[in-house]
From Swiss-Prot:
Subcellular location per the Swiss-Prot or TrEMBL entry: Nucleus; Nucleus, Nucleolus
Tissues expressing the protein: Ubiquitously expressed.
Keyword Acetylation: yes
Keyword hit for Coiled coil: yes
Gene Ontology BP, a term: protein catabolic process
Name the record gives this protein: Pre-mRNA-splicing factor SPF27
GO CC annotation terms, alphabetical: catalytic step 2 spliceosome; centrosome; nuclear speck; nucleolus; nucleoplasm; nucleus; Prp19 complex; spliceosomal complex
Organism: Homo sapiens (Human)
Disulfide bridges in this chain: none
Name of the gene: BCAS2
First-listed, main subcellular location of the protein, grouped into a coarse class: nucleus
Protein role: Required for pre-mRNA splicing as component of the activated spliceosome. Component of the PRP19-CDC5L complex that forms an integral part of the spliceosome and is required for activating pre-mRNA splicing. May have a scaffolding role in the spliceosome assembly as it contacts all other components of the core complex. The PRP19-CDC5L complex may also play a role in the response to DNA damage (DDR).
Keyword field: Acetylation, Coiled coil, mRNA processing, mRNA splicing, Nucleus, Phosphoprotein, Spliceosome
Length: 225
């Protein structure tokens, strides 16, 4: 329920879910759903109700490779197979048996393949020597990250629990005050009713006494004459 003395956009929520009762009573859920349905019928957003927002840039994080893949998928083209030509050692064709340039290219290709394999062997040797320790360090870092994340999670859960307890205590305290004030209001209303009824009775008695005195005065005057 919105307050009348609030700044535009501010809302005061007067619900006390930890204190209020009767949510499971028959018809309550249907009444709430009817209120929601009524509000949704009143809210008619226009087609450009998000016009105040900047236009989204869906391609902000796209790379050329991603863009090419999206275009390939849109065109329903098959993915290109991995080329294994660089790992082959073809000899010069029959027409190039006496071509020195062709043979030089084959030799260069063989040297590149050999160097590539040598680098792979060196990488395997380095991995065999240092890979185990590097993997252990990596796992230790992961463990520390998990422990830190779990501690943060526990802090958040405790904060949420404390907040819920605080909300519950505040609502129960407010509910008790409201119940006490309601009881006082009922008592005051009852007392006011009793006072008003007593006043009416006294006014009637005063009126009757005045009438009796008036009739007695008339009777005395009549007797005097």
């Amino acid at each position: 329920m919105a307050g009348t003395g609030l700044v535009a956009g501010e809302v005061v929520v007067d619900a006390l879910p930890y204190f209020d009762q009767g949510y499971e009573a028959p018809g309550v859920r249907e009444a709430a759903a009817a209120l929601v349905e009524e509000e949704t019928r009143r809210y008619r957003p226009t087609k450009n109700y998000l016009s105040y927002l900047t236009a989204p840039d869906y391609s902000a994080f796209e790379t050329d490779i991603m863009r090419n893949e999206f275009e390939r998928l849109a065109a329903r083209q098959p993915i290109e197979l991995l080329s294994m030509k660089r790992y082959e050692l073809p000899a010069p064709s029959s027409g190039q048996k006496n071509d020195i340039t062709a043979w030089q290219e084959c030799v260069n290709n063989s040297m590149a393949q050999l160097e590539h394999q040598a680098v792979r062997i060196e990488n395997l040797e380095l991995m065999s020597q240092h890979g185990c320790n590097a993997w252990k360090v990596y796992n230790e870092n992961l463990v520390h990250m998990i422990e830190h994340a779990q501690k943060e999670l526990q802090k958040l859960r405790k904060h949420i629990q404390d907040l819920n307890w605080q909300r519950k205590n505040m609502q129960l305290t407010a509910g008790s005050k409201l119940r006490e004030m309601e009881s006082n209001w009922v008592s005051l209303v009852s007392k006011n009713y009793e006072i008003e009824r007593t006043i009416v009775q006294l006014e009637n008695e005063i009126y009757q006494i005045k009438q009796q005195h008036g009739e007695a005065n008339k009777e005395n005057i009549r007797q005097d004459f």
